[in-house]
């Protein structure tokens, strides 16, 4: 039987704090490493995943293997392109898919780098820079409807997690403000998650990397006008 950890989701959402619209200034490899998230930090996206060891859902990328470094072209120091992805093992009864890329910063805040929802369950892969495979939500890194490429100003290796959720029904976001943020998506997913799969990627900014001006979509308040 699928054991779910979603019972704590409502409480987690109430306490969810997102970072300011800029990439983190502090480095860190993760829990236990200097500069990593504080002890007891709650990873809100991870908390939504069901604890199903028998799940067949698998998320991969032809550009990067799980646990390896994200190629430069998919970061803010390269092309800022979103990575190509593929998945297999979508469970029977799946009616919708959700994709979230996030990072737990040194202050324990969940940063959303990529949010795609209402993905057709028949979809099995997406190309580099794809935007037409679902609906895109807000990236909290820059407060824009976009894929926010890893571009941290802080030193050290950082981990970013892409999670694919298989849902038994489309998340009801009819009452959510537009453009959509991750909070209502996670809330609407409650009780509908059949399976979830992660792809963990790492990135360390090159020494002496300079800031560059990037063409970006309008911020949330600008997009609403």
Identify the residue ranges that each predicted region occupies.
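N-terminus-centered regions that define maturation/targeting leaders and the start
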Residues: 21-225
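Positively charged n-region of N-terminal signal peptides that target proteins for export
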Residues: 1-5
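Bacterial N-terminal signal peptides
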Residues: 7-17
